Amino acid sequence: MDNPSSEPAMEAPRPNSLPKAERTEARPARRWRWPIAILALGAALVFVVQNVERFENNAADQNLATLSAIGLTVLLLAFWAIFFTGLPRGARTRLLVGGVALIAGFLSLVRVDGVSGDIRPKLVWRWSPKADARLAKEIAGEGKPADATIDLTQTSDDDFPQFLGPSRNGQVVVRQALARDWAARPPKTVWRQPIGAGWSSFAVVGPYAITQEQRGDRECVTCYEVSTGKLLWAHAEGGHFNKLLGGEGPRATPTISGGRVYALGANGRLDCLDGASGEVVWTHDVLAENNAPNLEWGKSCSPAVIDDLVVVSAGGPDGHSLVAFDKASGDEIWHAGDDPSSYSSPLLATLAGVEQILIVNHHAIVAHDPANGRVLWRYPWIGDQPKVPQPVPIGADKVLIASGYGIGCMLLDIKAGPDGELSASEAWKKHSLKLKPKFTNVVLHEGFVYGLDDGRSLVCLDLTRGERKWQGGHYGHGQILLVGDLLLVQSEEGDVALVEATPKRYRELTRFKALEGKTWNNPALAGRYLLVRNAEEAACYELPLE
């Protein structure tokens, strides 16, 4: 029986029954739980993206996912600030208007001037003029200056006449070895100057260097004097290819042969120019004539001169994938293949005793007979990503193909069957993810392959099983040449370095700053003269020799 004298139990006060001062103190504490949780979620997402295995082989996807996680965090915080802070309506309105004004003000002051190979945006002041716009007026009087005598028919062993050098494989033979210590004997600046936009390299014959560039609303093929950087002639055509992620201007590198220049523009115009004046000898609209669409990032195929033919990748259907023209007259000789193009260039090779033209297309690597274009063999190359690196013939019957975007590389065996027909099979059990060049090329030296792994590091790959011997350094999405027993590596940031080409260890010997800004263009080495460029500036350096 209850004691009637006992006091009734005290009931816990409800939140609304708390004194107003206590409720006011409790509300801010609860209010900050959500933004703290949102920030924790954002941090967790970024941590997962940076460490999950899916992104280990693709830095660009990793960066995009990181930016997405940060963007989602900011949006959630903004949503909370506007709708759930408990602030008066007027204060929330001011917060919204202030945030929009801040973003609009920021966007009115800066613009995205391209991205790195890993999709890191480059921000510049909106009023900053573009490099090609500053140069547009300088090319108004295109053509050969009256006092210039230009002869591209005189060749030498020092020439670098096409994409990736004399043999189109990134290997440069020098008569005298390069000095290995640039701190003691630095490269000499011959000239350094602005240039129009584009990702073309230089082709060099004798004292002349030819490249392609964008100047204002015109796509140009330009001839410079190697010793001075003086513009000798220019051929300009209306046209302007531009993509935010891929940049603007031409992508391919001209080919010099027999005193003429063969150049393919980003929109598919193939020109044969007189090397003495830059005047048009013949021209073709490769895309229109072959019913082919342009590529997302523009035509990047550097024309291959093979005997009397000029060969380019058109990418058209119904036998119009690869096209060959008579290099003298421009008449079409043959067209063959059905594969859409990608971003590589034709390469002549001899495999299994048969001379053939190799081309990496969007879905396959294909070999064509140079005489008539007939497809000799085809190997499907996985993935829907851009295929940029050149195939690398190895020995008598093997070829290495490679790609970035998390795909890696594969070694193929090319064999002739009893009927003489060629076929390709995999020499490794699976694709090697130890080397994933995105839009750079690899070089072969004494049975080992060297290349840049998806913007992360330089890699030496053993060809027996596709295993990595070493990795080192950081060169971004740069480019590479083999010079004797040295790797000349150009970084994405514009540095040029020398690295020993040995499977024993990674060892960078020396480096210097050659250019400023994003540098995707391939370097050209003609004798002791190194010509480099990017979308804003070009330079020529005299390298010291041993």
Residue spans of the language-model regions?
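Membrane-embedded alpha-helical segments of integral membrane proteins
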Residues: 36-86
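Blade-level signature of beta-propeller repeat domains, shared across WD40, Kelch, NHL, RCC1
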Residues: 407, 518-546
